[in-house]
Amino acid sequence: MKIILWLSLFLFLVAGATPVFGVVEDLQIESVESVAEGRDFGRVGPYEKVVGRLTLSLDPETERIVDLNRAPQGSDGRVRFEADIYLLRPVHAERGRVTLFLEIPNRGGKAIVRYFNRGATRTFDPVTSESLGDGFLMEEGYTLAWIGWQFDVPDQNNLMKVDVVPATSGGRVEGLVRADHVFEEESDIFELGHVGHRAYLPTAIDDERHRLTVRSTRLGPGKLVPRESWSSRFPDEVTGEGLAVRLDGGFQKGKVYELVYASADPVVVGVGLAALRDGAAWLRDSEDSPVAVERVLAMGISQTGR
């Protein structure tokens, strides 16, 4: 089937015991509502949507998460953060499978319903009968889940995010950020936050470490673009959304442009992957879980499938 060619599908087994360094401390449910106007999905019956926020904590000495020991800690010495969670579950849990189907959100979105159910619309809130398509996953009784793990997705309704913690303890951290882009059409704007995502802000407009280069091929030699021929644009100095570079004469189609610039105050991005791991394990194992499942099946599309 063509649909399989578009997906990178994988199975993973979450460790049987609660992860040593990760704990889900709380689930704050924000809403529970019926989907598809109460449509019956065969023997399984109707589904409902659950939206909320997970509060998680980690041991700051977890070495696999870079800079976690630089994050602010609570009085008990643990690092806390929150992640979005979105569930589609059978109203009658006993009729469903004991399998949780977790999609690793690509850019905060939701796609498995559209692919597996042949949903007619692309949406971040798949609750209409049209968006749920032929209802395949529901008729099979799967509980569907999405957990936010990216910190840089745009601040839009129903995009899945994780509120990451800053690596600010012990003094300010500075370093270099690299962004590159190949333009399909000529343009005078180079957006650093791809498709509206958040980008790190530069330390200063005129920092001498900022460099823009251009090359004809991916592995070819780079040519330095004179500093006086390009400038920066800062629509939102708080979030970094809309951060861009303008180039006199514009960016050429097919060329590889690379910007390296100085920035500061990094966030601990790795907690997003911990949110996926610990959130999935908690949904499966905890007595406080809002779903009745015994195993987790996960998949990703595009970057999350790689």
Which role fits each region the language model picked out?
Residues 1-5:
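Positively charged n-region of N-terminal signal peptides that target proteins for export
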Residues 6-16:
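Bacterial N-terminal signal peptides
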Residues 18-22:
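Sec/Tat signal peptide C-region and signal peptidase I cleavage site
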Residues 23-306:
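C-terminal His-loop and adjacent cap/lid subdomain of alpha/beta-hydrolase
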